[in-house]
Amino acid sequence: MTSLVSLENVSVSFGQRRVLSDVSLELKPGKILTLLGPNGAGKSTLVRVVLGLVTPDEGVIKRNGKLRIGYVPQKLYLDTTLPLTVKRFLRLRPGTHKEDILPALKRVQAGHLINAPMQKLSGGETQRVLLARALLNRPQLLVLDEPTQGVDVNGQVALYDLIDQLRRELDCGVLMVSHDLHLVMAKTDEVLCLNHHICCSGTPEVVSLHPEFISMFGPRGAEQLGIYRHHHNHRHDLQGRIVLRRGNDRS
């Protein structure tokens, strides 16, 4: 399978501060990669590297031709006094045709919001509008920066269900950043735990194996949510430096 984007031993420094060290990953069509880690771990910097906004100091980046990327930012800041409807907000994207707006909203089950004020949307509704905006680019790769932040568990289930549907329909790759260190989308193909470097990687444990979780969130939640169990062989201090490796007395 041809890669959309691949990073090999990528490192990024800002001044004397090393933010990313020897990071490798591969994004493929139809595959979901979830990136998680603590605050300040370099997740946003890694996303910017994938988007082509940051040039690494070391390592190799390969992109598949003229890659079309749809990006959903972590937060959207709007002036609360600015009269801005969903339709007008989506028209602000360069190259957007007005006839494409309603179909994009309907694709994310948000067609009814087309004339709603952006400032009145809930967290889940805002994420759907931002996702519709990303789809206007007909993306081969969707990059979602903490899409479930501020969304309750039921909203997360619905959003993950939608992302899975879009992934299958478009056969696009998905890079998703998660603020939750353990609860991830169950259909994620690979999870990377980042703390300036890749601490560990693997697949999520499907929540359907846990009857108590099913009883709390129902079978639909169990289908879409998964638990990722970390398997680090080291730990970090408050500055992100490796201070201990298991089996060693010194770092």
Swiss-Prot record:
One of its GO terms (biological process) is response to zinc ion. PROSITE patterns: ABC_TRANSPORTER_2 (PS50893), ZNUC (PS51298). It catalyses: Zn(2+)(out) + ATP(in) + H2O(in) = Zn(2+)(in) + ADP(in) + phosphate(in) + H(+)(in). It is found in: Cell inner membrane. One of its GO terms (cellular component) is plasma membrane. GO terms for molecular function: ABC-type zinc transporter activity; ATP binding; ATP hydrolysis activity. InterPro entries: AAA+_ATPase, ABC_transporter-like_ATP-bd, Metal_Ion_Import_ABC, P-loop_NTPase. Keywords: ATP-binding, Cell inner membrane, Cell membrane, Ion transport, Membrane, Nucleotide-binding, Translocase, Transport, Zinc, Zinc transport. Transmembrane segments: none annotated. Its EC number is 7.2.2.20. Belongs to the ABC transporter superfamily. Zinc importer (TC 3.A.1.15.5) family. The complex is composed of two ATP-binding proteins (ZnuC), two transmembrane proteins (ZnuB) and a solute-binding protein (ZnuA). Part of the ABC transporter complex ZnuABC involved in zinc import. Responsible for energy coupling to the transport system. This is Zinc import ATP-binding protein ZnuC. The gene is znuC.
